[in-house]
């Protein structure tokens, strides 16, 4: 069976991506990153999702982005209750580049040629590292920078949610049997994973379930 490394945050998008990769016949190795995020309950959610969806392995890697700072997700900066114009304060500098690089390294060790990530259409209007151009550029870099890219079959970066709305992601996840009740999206989630219901992540998540006509399983504080 082909191997793939899937970035798993513990949120609804990455849970759906795991199921999509498995449907394509990949043996999924899930990678989560403890980067200093304030909402650490998402890593607990990642462990739940990995177990429930039967991944081959789940690895959590520590990278202290809090020591660099620059984001409301790592610093003592208030998370806004509504999105605004421009790049939001919840953008973590270079986070997706760093996470994909870690996934790339693990893929090489595993002999895997495929990496999956959950960037999507809802995100790339505000986050520069969620744009299709970024995904294509990282794939090009991966094939220039690795032994697999130079001597092997090459690396493919999959972003299957790239052009899907949150509602479409929910519908696809439900079709594939994803238990979204295990996931955490909230930027202000408490230690038990209960969501605030007010931040931008909560708003987009709720809209997704409403759009899909699916009951919202989110635990709210």
Swiss-Prot record:
A single GO BP: queuosine biosynthetic process
Binding annotation for Zn(2+): 186, 196, 199, 202
InterPro entries: QueC, Rossmann-like_a/b/a_fold
Function, as annotated: Catalyzes the ATP-dependent conversion of 7-carboxy-7-deazaguanine (CDG) to 7-cyano-7-deazaguanine (preQ(0)).
Domain of life: Bacteria
Cofactor: binding comment: Binds 1 zinc ion per subunit.
Protein family according to the UniProt entry: Belongs to the QueC family.
Cofactor(s) essential for the protein: Zn(2+)
Binding residues for ATP: 8-18
Identification of the protein by name: 7-cyano-7-deazaguanine synthase
Pfam family for this entry, one: QueC
Enzyme class: ligase
Gene3D superfamilies in the record: HUPs
Reaction catalysis annotation: 7-carboxy-7-deazaguanine + NH4(+) + ATP = 7-cyano-7-deazaguanine + ADP + phosphate + H2O + H(+)
Protein keywords: ATP-binding, Ligase, Metal-binding, Nucleotide-binding, Queuosine biosynthesis, Zinc
Record gene name: queC
Gene Ontology molecular functions: ATP binding; ligase activity, forming carbon-nitrogen bonds; zinc ion binding
EC number(s) per entry: 6.3.4.20
Pathway: Purine metabolism; 7-cyano-7-deazaguanine biosynthesis
Keyword Metal-binding recorded: yes
């Amino acid at each position: 069976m082909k191997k793939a490394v899937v970035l798993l945050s513990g949120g609804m998008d990455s849970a759906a991506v795991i199921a999509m990769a498995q449907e394509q016949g990949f043996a999924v190795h899930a990678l989560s990153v403890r980067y200093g995020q304030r909402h650490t309950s998402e890593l607990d959610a990642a462990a739940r999702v990995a177990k429930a969806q039967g991944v081959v392995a789940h690895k959590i890697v520590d990278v202290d982005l809090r020591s660099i700072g620059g984001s409301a997700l790592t610093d003592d900066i208030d998370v806004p209750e509504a999105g605004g114009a421009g790049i939001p304060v919840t953008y973590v500098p270079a986070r997706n580049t760093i996470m994909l690089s870690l996934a790339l390294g693990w893929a090489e060790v595993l002999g895997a040629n495929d990496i999956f990530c959950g960037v999507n259409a809802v995100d790339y209007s505000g986050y520069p590292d969620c744009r299709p151009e970024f995904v294509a550029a990282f794939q090009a870099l991966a094939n220039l920078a690795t032994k697999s890219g130079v001597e092997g079959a090459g690396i493919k970066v999959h972003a299957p949610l790239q052009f899907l709305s949150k509602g479409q992601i929910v519908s696809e996840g439900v079709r594939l049997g994803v238990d979204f009740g295990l996931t955490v999206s909230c930027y202000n989630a408490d230690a038990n994973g209960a969501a605030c219901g007010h931040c931008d992540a909560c708003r987009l998540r709720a809209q997704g379930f409403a759009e899909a006509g699916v009951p919202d399983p989110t635990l709210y504080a």
